[in-house]
Amino acid sequence: MAMNTLQKLCVVCSKCNECAMDVECLKYCDPNIVSMDSTAFRRNGVMVIHLYRTLYPALVSQNAVQTSVLTLYMEMLLQGLYDTMREIDMALTDFGTHRDRQRYYRRVLKLDSCNRHESITITFAPELALTIDLATLNDVERLLCKINCVYGAVDASQGVAVCRRLLSLLARLCDICPVAGPEIYRETVTCFQCYEELMAVPNQGRSINRRMQGLLCDHITIKKVLVQLDMDAQAVEQDMGDIAIRAPSVKGIIRAIKSLASFSPASYAYINDAEEALRGYNLFSEIPDRIYSLSDYTYWSKTSEAIVRHVGITMRQLNVSHSLWKTLRTELSRYHYGEDLEDVFTLGEGRFGGDERIYVGSIFAAPGKVVDMITSMSIKSFENNPLFNRLHESNEIYAKIKSLIEEIRGVGDGPAAGAARSRAEAASGAGAGGEEGAGAAAGRGNTGGDEGAGTTTAMSSALECGDPLLRVHDVNKEVNVRKRAYLKKVSEMGYNKVMACIRNQEHLVTKLVNVNLVGTVCLEAVSKIMNGFLSRQRSITEAETYPDVAESLGYDEHLYVINNLVHKRLPSELLPQLGQQIYRFINGPMFTHYLDRHPLPYNVNMAYACDNAGILPHVKEDLVRCADGTVVPSDWMTVGYMGFFRFADIRELNDLQKMVWAHIRELVLSVALYNETFGKQLALWRVEDGDEIGDGIILTYNPESPLILRRGDRSYRSRDLYLLLYKHLSVDSETLADAGSRASVADLCQVERPGPIAEQRSSTQNVKKKRKRMSLLELVRDVDGAGGDDLVPPCLYK
């Protein structure tokens, strides 16, 4: 089966990604080695130039009409590949002359300039313009969410220009490398996908801002664990093949790396021995005191291990491993090229020592191991805090476990030996004097006689004092029991808090240290917003070919429609549905969950847009009041003649937003009242609806031609809503009238009152109507009595 154009483009994108990754790695390689074997580089460069001259112009043309994440990304990638490969080629030519590696790296890595900042100015009105500074991927995503909320107030041409500048900034931030640099994103700033994920789970009574605090975003950049340290040495040994035989020193280095990676500390080996000793005991076994103590200490040691992660690599091992890998690289370089390798990571290598390797990083250390080491070092530093003395007892616990195991092995191991020993101890205790031995056996831990002697002395002293309460109650013993219980509870609570804190911080360190790939969130947002502005831009060109109803209609027709609507009232049961329509037209094109398989209502999409844009609560309240609407037309009919979507003398963005909301509310409610009054089914559409648009009024958001009336194969434009409604009446009358009597609405208004409806039916039997025939007199009369017996044009019931 032949591939379509989209599939072919995906294949080309995959190959370009592979080439981009190789070129990005080439930036950090020794230029002397690259110059020796540059055949593949130049061959790929020729292919990139060919794609740039043939495919790139087509992508730019496509993105000027309709965008997608793939076409936008391909445009960025081809432009970046072309510029990068040209820069590397010129830098290699320059290196052949001056032989200065540092100069080469500064040019290729662009260390002497910074082009990762952008200031964008958006003009909303002649006296209202805002400037936004951008420096990270998070800033781009947040700006697009804000533009989505003021979508109707931004000019279409300006919106497309802003999206193009944002795309250019994304290209500079990401370059051609799929791995995101740590300076181009902020992991603690959430995106709109983080918000949508939180909305899918119960909020448990917490606000969205509180739930998003401390949340790490894994959408703008996606965390990937790509390297496993334990597998590196084996994989390198397999790749080298015969080199290990011809270069004996290489084989010895690999053997040292393997032994270093497999090393694990032996200080906690007694835990395994303790578990083996405890495995022979069950619920029905007689448990000796030593076994009970061994189980108790093993439990506490595991509790400590739940907090302190004992990793298989220490700081010294990390430095030794880095040194061994560096030596291996040098040996391979001498074998292949006859000289030492000096890449960008070699510069300043001797300056780092101690724990600095963690913070600088190593190309030979797996990120997961570094994360474990940072966690372990943090816990060791935390253990030095005297407020948590329990953590200092870890070594004592292991020492006690060791001594118990040695005692058990000395007298015999297993349940049988333990039972015999227990019986012997019980017999000796009974023979020695009864109650003291029984008390020690019952106490499990009170194996010595000093505590019993001290308690007996205290009781005797209390009895001598004559306190009757102390004769039947040991207060000192109860105080000690309560004290131990309290300390245990506080200790458990402290451990839980420490574990939660460490777990959260470990997530942050993992996000920072591991490889993060650039996500598609920003490109998705740019594509949606840009497609909306492109649709509006196309509608401007198309509207110029449509007749303007203002050329044939005037202010009288405008007043005629208003006078027929202003005394009516909307049915209150329609307000919830109309409120949803208001939210639909106020919201931008970024959140379209009403098109999902399981669609969400328009108000939920609007809530997503407001929360991600950071709209203040009192502004949200104003929006809700606007969308709730009223049944009285005088409350929403505020737009003047020929003034729809024309905003003058606006100096505050909040005022501009409210005016946009008011215009959209008037559009939705006036059309609904028009349908109720005149018995029509006039629909409303957004300009972004595309092929789904049918007959009705199309909102373009453009001040030049904000409204377009489509009726069959004819379309009209206007800046006045009520002129379009009058035109719709006229077009409907022409459709229903006979072919020989196509009079205008104004002429039909002068016709005498027709006879009964029954006499009119004979002239309309051959006319196909969309709705059930009914008495139009009741439709057009003023039901509130304000209009008396006045009627609307007779054309409505012909």
From Swiss-Prot:
Gene Ontology molecular function: any one: zinc ion binding
Gene Ontology CC annotations of this record: host cell nucleus
Subunit relationships: Associates with TRM2 and TRM3 to form the tripartite terminase complex. Interacts with portal protein.
Bias-annotated ranges (Gly residues): 430-452
Binding residues for ATP: Y674, N675, E676, T677, F678, G679, K680, Q681
Native organism taxonomy: Viruses, Duplodnaviria, Heunggongvirae, Peploviricota, Herviviricetes
Name of protein: Tripartite terminase subunit 1
Organism: Murid herpesvirus 1 (strain Smith) (MuHV-1)
Main location (coarse class): host cell
Keyword annotations of the record: ATP-binding, Host nucleus, Late protein, Metal-binding, Nucleotide-binding, Viral genome packaging, Viral release from host cell, Zinc, Zinc-finger
Protein's GO biological process: viral DNA genome packaging
Region (Disordered): 416-458
